[in-house]
């Protein structure tokens, strides 16, 4: 029985369907699953977010010291609890990952996840804030490209700058929408995020830095004198731009992380 057949069998056995509200799509592509689990070792504790039917979980249990499976859907918890009842290296938590203290789940862990598209940015943000140094996620391709873009690129967004400040991120490979049951409307990508020992640059006030970046990308087509007007008085902003040698017509989406940090430091 291949993984596709196994997935269909489990869905039929437990009479379950993917929950659209929870963004469930069950991955059955063996190569993609192996790629996601590729860097897991017997020394690792893995936090798996949204294990679903347990397809990836089964692989992780063979490779990791321990798997902490965090699943919101009680039906999926029932399924994986029965599937893996003979394993002593799994802990199953029926909860929303965003409501948990991630650092308390394990003192040192890697994260692996097939994330719901609608909540990807929130989860990535919380994982990077936590003491997680290694994150491998399967997410919507468009979001992956935004996360892995370079600050100043056309595809960049606020999440680009946030991730780039704390970590290195790369797209490992793309995954066809035909690799899922049911098939989503968009293509997916596997992204690997490695947190840096220290932030990429130094800034006096991180909170202000990310506030300015977020404000800018809510008005990304406007000049920086307009997009940052809520946080910085226009006269002060003009002084800062002059000091940095930037014209008033500059758009924030054109700026590097370093320039945003300098603006924040000069406020």
Over which residues does each language-model region extend?
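Catalytic cores of RNA-modifying enzymes
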Residues: 1-214, 242, 253, 257
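C-terminal lobe and adjacent flexible extensions of AdoMet/dcAdoMet transferase-like proteins
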Residues: 215-267
